[in-house]
Amino acid sequence: MSQTTNHKKVAIIGASGYTGVELMRLIAGHPEMDLVAATGDSQAGTAVASLYPNLAAHYPDLVFGDSNPDTLAQQIDGVDVAFLGLPHEASLSLAPTLVGKVGCVVDLSAAYRLKEASAYPQWYGFTHDQPELLKKAVYGLPELHRQELVGAQLVATPGCYVTAATMALAPLVRLGLIQNSGIIVDAASGVSGAGRVPKQNNNFTTVNEDMNAYGLLDHRHTPEMQEQIGAELLFTPHLVPMNRGILATCYARPVNGSSITTQSLIDALKSFYANEPFVVIRSESPSTKATLGSNAVHITARYDERTGYVMVISALDNLCKGASGGALQAANVALGLPETSGLTSIGVYP
């Protein structure tokens, strides 16, 4: 990993999982960032190119380090941005030791996403012992929080499902076009959303030729969606047999007395997201494959006169815009770099 003067120095702590390796891929193409450290405790001592051959051309000699306190202190010395690809409770504990020592901490876990520490025992099963730092964390969705992100020291990257649902629904709630209760979000995700570690419910013979709903009534992304959309909703996620992608189909009622058509909904979304580099408002139904490998989210909307429902559909790559790409986009804003650096809105096809 060669370093260039004036480039931002990057560390990824917890780099051996899918979000970590996606970050490494994106940073390899970033014109103003250099990766100087990548830890992965379960893979410490393993060559990155051995575990992920797709990165061999850019990181031929890089080896995953470990994150014990002494070693980590050396690895993050002088770092401009540290991405945390760790379990929620690990990020909860580590973030306070990094904030103020590195320019910006970007956490890809849920440890600092919710507004209230009191919500964590119910939705995540642990007590949040950093309520003051939680208040300082900035939610990492630039399309809705761009100004707050400028100069942020701690960024909480949104959940993948949350990004898909929020970008579909938040504009219509904010514009007063749909009711802020009774919303339904049905979303389907590829298997990479479950992470790299093999489990019974994500091995090939389990997911192949299958589709199932999970997290019924209590998926942990629910409160995050409600906070960011500003509405009460029912969320049901589904696992589908593809590697990457999320398709969210959302249903809502129009505000009483409003005059809504399909075209007025699409026009409202286009106006809300005007000049957003990664938002594509389409007349056609979005597809996950069109977003593969990109930081784009594709959105469309319909009004059904027969039932009186508004339907909004969004598609994105769960590992890119839904995780690592969104994290890099937020980091760019926080560090004062061009927001699109290292990212593309063009998917890989076919």
Question: Where do the PLM segments sit?
Answer:
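C-terminal active-site/capping subdomain that shapes the small-molecule cofactor and substrate pocket
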Residues: Y251-P350
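Short amphipathic alpha-helical segments
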Residues: G151, I246-A248, G308-V310
